[in-house]
Amino acid sequence: MEKRLGVKPSPASWVLPGYCWQTSVKLPRSLYLLYSFFCFSVLWLSTDADESRCQQGKTLYGAGLRTEGENHLRLLAGSLPFHACRAACCRDSACHALWWLEGMCFQADCSKPQSCQPFRTDSSNSMLIIFQKSQTTDDLGLLPEDDEPHLLRLGWGRTSWRRQSLLGAPLTLSVPSSHHQSLLRDRQKRDLSVVPTHGAMQHSKVNHSEEAGALSPTSAEVRKTITVAGSFTSNHTTQTPEWPKNVSIHPEPSEHSSPVSGTPQVKSTEHSPTDAPLPVAPSYSYATPTPQASSQSTSAPHPVVKELVVSAGKSVQITLPKNEVQLNAFVLPEAEPGETYTYDWQLITHPTDYSGEVERKHSQSLQLSKLTPGLYEFKVTVDGQNAHGEGYVNVTVKPEPRKNRPPVAVVSPQFQEISLPTTSTIIDGSQSTDDDKIVQYHWEELKGPLREEKISEDTAILKLSKLVPGNYTFSLTVVDSDGATNSTTASLTVNKAVDYPPVANAGPNQVITLPQNSITLFGNQSTDDHGITSYEWSLSPSSKGKVVEMQGVRTPALQLSAMQEGDYTYQLTVTDTAGQQATAQVTVIVQPENNKPPQADAGPDKELTLPVDSTTLDGSKSTDDQRVVSYLWEQSRGPDGVQLENANSSVATVTGLQVGTYVFTLTVKDERNLQSQSSVNVIVKEEINKPPVAKIAGNVVVTLPTSTAELDGSRSSDDKGIVSYLWTRDETSPAAGEVLNHSDHHPVLFLSNLVEGTYTFHLKVTDAKGESDTDRTTVEVKPDPRKSNLVEIILDVNVSQLTERLKGMLIRQIGVLLGVLDSDIIVQKIQPYTEQSTKMLFFVQNDPPHQLFKGHEVAAMLKSELQKQKADFLIFRALEISTVTCQLNCSDHGHCDSFTKRCVCDPFWMENFIKVQLRDGDSNCEWSVLYVIIASFVIVVALGILSWTTICCCKRQKGKPKRKSRYKILDATDQESLELKPTSRAGSKQKGPTLSSSLMHSESELDSDDAIFTWPDREKGKLLYGQNGSVPNGQTPLKSRSAREEIL
């Protein structure tokens, strides 16, 4: 149960004040001050205000907290910042965990075993902090850090949290499956049945701190769940010595128990001002130790609740149209003979709009049917005789996969016919449809007249040109995203040029009224496909004998005059280039005269103020059915001495006016001498002029990127009216900024392209008498608060080609790269960068609470993601990505140029071009020029030494001489001569055979077969000329050789 309250003091601060003040009244005055000092000291020590004992333990992001029982979860009243919420929890001894959920602060009392359980939430703004206040995690009733199977049951080990882009790395708690199984086996082997001894259950004296709620269970109590059965009345409160005085025990209602009996539960008697609901979350139940009902029950042994290991199986995943599944619960240990377990299935998590049917909710197997797509989480509770356990399982229902339907090729028009000189047309195939999308169009000309090349295109709309007469048949084949195809045909007929006869048009019938007796007829609306060569007007035979004068009878316009009352019919004949003719007739009706008197109009009354003493009288708006032939202006009333100029015209001028009222009468006449009169009043007043008053609405404050402003001076006033406005800019104002539509001469001044700074403008108003007045106002332009977080991207596209639809696609692609929603990317400005590129400024924020992401992090992440993706991931190639304001630190050896967005290094420093080219591409000033010169010199010297060494080794290798081999291939003749030679004497060496190779020529080949040179001659160094030349190639003592060696 939750409570909403302020910062809660410690229980000791409630008990000690009453004790101190009641006791101090009984003391003598001499000891009153000493006793009061002692009480204040004890009170200060009991407030737990020392936050040094408050050590923060684990912090879980995206997690919430649920508690068992009542008064364990409290919501602090009011809106507190995070640091105030944490400080309040540190000061409160009953606060062991802090749950911060979207600006709301919840404190949890986890002093009882297993009273606080974390769970995963879908909110990214949820954070759970566990404090260590001189107690271990087990003592506080929270999960120990090694109890990771419970975290797996909450879904933190199987589901990766949503990636928090730009704000931090994702938090994922995972446990290997082998470790999970070992923990389950260890828990199964535990002996959970422990019966406390009589001495341990004896009542002990409770001091003030114990009465304040400082009853912390031991770690053994956390691991062993003990329930105490008892019978209590629903309206009776039993005070026990084991619990504080402000805690009462009431029976907990159960659906299987009567209102007068049940299991007692502890409920605090403290009252909170208001109650506030908590976020809805799944309910996890754990058995907790309960206090003894009475001191007499401590001597009897308590039943022990065994913990059951319950498994609902692995998560189930089905795909529609299959919408049924059966969940089975498995329990260890199995029920004893004669004992059965009760099962209770509960739906914890489900989709927003879901439906389905559940059967056998209280059996071991749960049957689900008619499920809708989404994620369902079920909890099964198993109870037996003094045994309890829970299990969880997820069921995921996926929507039915889409079945592809082949596309439908549609051409429009399917049949088309044109005639020369029209030689081009189009056939539209873009109306072809598919259940997903069409990825390819292919047009093929199946039949047509003989031409140079047939038509074959891959576009949705086929554009045809330079057609020749004949019949064409075109085939359209469409391919959808799944590779299915469909085809259709379109027919086109091109006819030869046809010369159609002309179409004569003499115009509509005309009606005139005497005395008008002339009119012009027009036949230029006549048409022909190749042009008209002649026009001829004539009087119709039905109008022969009527008097009329005709001019231009062989032109498109016929002029008629001297017509009399009656009907005239005229005939127009037109001839084209082929000599074909067409005729048309038109009738002119001449009506008799019907004259009406004219209508005089002298115009509106006028009011003048001296020194203006003249005005004009306008009667030009007078009308007549025929025409007005005369005007006459006369003074009917008023002071004498005025002069009328042009009194016989429609517009007259009156001069010499004095103060007073004048009445002037206008008389008009028509041709039949019919007349009409009208009067106009002219009032002349004395001059009383007041200077004008200039007034501007007020100062204007503009915050960039809004760069327009409006200054309203229309509240300026004058008794006669303001004739001119003039806005001027003060000399101290920034020169940037433009005036729109010459509004500096109008009451309202419109400004654009303002820059940061303060503008001062002066308004000068002038009346008809030349008197003027001025007013002053300021326009303060504040800098853009998002300027440091703005990111600019240069796109390779003309700004006129970037449509709103393409802009939306680009924003969605950038959102995918950054891992944010489309609505989180706010485009501030799109403007041309060059003739073929466009610059787009945007920033990224999360929704809510609209926290801006850092611009340099957004730019860096966008660059990194684009390097990982393909070059054409974005619909337009990104030429450059950077922040609007240059935020490079230049390695603290230079400054950043705001125009080029690159570092300008200090003297003796230069850019690390290797890092720029191979890594992040950001400009820097990391290298010292001196070190670069030294390193370059060392590299050049090392390369020179290496090159010299390589050349020397190569020359030495080439200088070693190579001994040429001297061999001769034995033939049959040589072998026979070797066999016929006599054997040498003992001790003498065998004579060498005759050699005749290209390298060693013997003179024996030229003389005779008896001349034989022996090897001893060679051993003595007497080589014959002609064998190896005159230059010796080296001599070495010869060893005794065999016959074959001597031959070789």
From Swiss-Prot:
Annotated Polar residues bias: 231-241, 985-994, 1027-1039
Q: Which residue windows does the record flag with biased composition (Low complexity)?
A: 247-261, 287-300
Report residue spans for region: Disordered: 198-218, 231-300, 593-623, 980-1007, 1024-1048
Which ranges carry the MANSC domain? 49-127
Spell out which residues lie on the membrane's Cytoplasmic side: 1-29, 950-1048
Ranges annotated as spanning the membrane: 30-50, 929-949
Q: Which domain of life is it from?
A: Eukaryota
Q: Which residues lie on this side of the membrane: Extracellular?
A: 51-928
Note whether Phosphoprotein occurs among the keywords.
Answer: yes
Kindly list the biological process annotations in GO that this record carries. acrosome assembly; flagellated sperm motility; neuron migration; proacrosomal vesicle fusion; receptor-mediated endocytosis of virus by host cell; response to auditory stimulus; spermatogenesis
Keywords, A to Z, come to: Cell membrane, Glycoprotein, Golgi apparatus, Membrane, Phosphoprotein, Repeat, Transmembrane, Transmembrane helix
Residues that bear Phosphothreonine: T973, T1036
Q: How does it sit in the membrane?
A: Multi-pass membrane protein
Modification Phosphoserine occurs at: S977, S1008, S1030
Q: Domain PKD, which positions?
A: 309-400, 408-497, 503-593, 599-687, 693-784
- Residues with attached carbohydrate: N246, N394
Which cellular components does GO assign to this protein?
cytoplasmic vesicle; Golgi membrane; nucleolus; plasma membrane; trans-Golgi network
Subunit organization: Interacts with RTN4R.
For this protein, the record's PANTHER family field holds:
DYSLEXIA-ASSOCIATED PROTEIN KIAA0319-LIKE PROTEIN (PTHR46182:SF3), FI19480P1 (PTHR46182)
Q: What is this protein called in UniProt?
A: Dyslexia-associated protein KIAA0319-like protein
